[in-house]
């Protein structure tokens, strides 16, 4: 069994929390290894472009893993843009640095230059870390089996940007282990997983899968459509949001429309289909 006490001796433990299953499992793993919630700090970097479900889940999660510090980029609003920002944020339901940045610069993030990660996550997180006086370690919930790229990550790695070591304690965990630790602690997963999403984060992510594009809410599509038309840009590489939504409703080849959703419900792997389309109350 890993001796985390020895591993993190004399070091402040900072856990990157996303509202996703892996970062939640990482917090539960610390608790399971004898750490109280006062012995590690949970930090969430808020892009202002999450699904409302994720914000609600973070509130729920605090009852199980302790308070979560929420960081924002606090993008400034030019006077000429205030009315537009206010209207779109009211439609969204919360303040959004993502929307403010799109309006300020007239562009969506795009691979490989994903400013959403750099401007809205890394920079606020770096500013926070540099306010700390003690030595610290950054814990990240990444698993090797998620992708070929992640399978090449090291468990320990030093980052000059953060001026600290990053530890990936779940690197060799399976998804089943992640689900099992939720169950042992009676912690529900983010409801997005139960409703067919494979990931939690920006909603939608510019790298979203076809099935995830199919599940984007009409309210979010409306905001994306307006920004696309206003700045003559596209959210997804393949075309405008309405084109991509139509494509997402087709089978392979893009010519035959689905009559039924044939994907196996993701709630089955959690054994929680009764919570699908619901929340965490």
Go through the PLM ranges and name each one.
Residues 1-185:
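ATP-dependent adenylation/nucleotidyltransferase module used to activate substrates
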Residues 5, 9-10, 188-190, 195-281:
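ATP/NTP-dependent adenylation/nucleotidyl-transfer catalytic domains that generate, transfer
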């Amino acid at each position: 069994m890993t001796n985390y006490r020895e591993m993190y001796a004399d070091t402040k433990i900072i856990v990157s929390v996303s509202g996703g299953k892996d970062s939640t499992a990482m917090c539960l793993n610390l608790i399971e290894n004898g750490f109280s919630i006062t012995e590690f700090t949970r930090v969430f970097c808020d892009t202002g472009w999450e699904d409302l479900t994720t914000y609600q889940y973070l509130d729920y999660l605090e009852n199980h893993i302790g308070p979560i510090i929420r960081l924002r980029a606090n993008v400034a609003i030019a006077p000429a843009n205030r009315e537009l920002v206010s209207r779109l944020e009211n439609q969204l339901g919360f303040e959004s640095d993502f929307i403010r940045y799109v309006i300020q610069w007239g562009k969506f993030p795009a691979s490989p230059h994903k400013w959403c990660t750099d401007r809205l996550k890394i920079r606020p997180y770096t500013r926070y870390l540099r306010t700390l006086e003690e030595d610290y370690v950054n814990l990240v919930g990444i698993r090797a089996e998620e992708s070929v790229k992640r399978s090449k990550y090291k468990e320990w790695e030093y980052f000059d940007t953060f001026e600290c070591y990053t530890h990936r304690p779940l690197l060799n965990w399976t998804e089943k282990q992640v689900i099992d630790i939720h169950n042992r602690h009676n912690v529900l997963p983010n409801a997005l997983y139960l409703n067919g999403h494979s990931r939690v984060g920006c909603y939608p992510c510019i790298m979203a899968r076809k099935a995830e594009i199919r599940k984007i809410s009409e309210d979010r599509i409306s905001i994306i459509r307006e920004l696309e038309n206003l700045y003559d840009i596209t959210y997804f590489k393949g075309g405008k949001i309405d084109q991509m939504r139509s494509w997402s409703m087709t089978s392979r080849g893009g010519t035959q429309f689905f009559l039924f959703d044939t994907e196996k419900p993701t709630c089955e792997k959690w054994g929680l289909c009764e919570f699908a389309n619901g929340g965490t109350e």
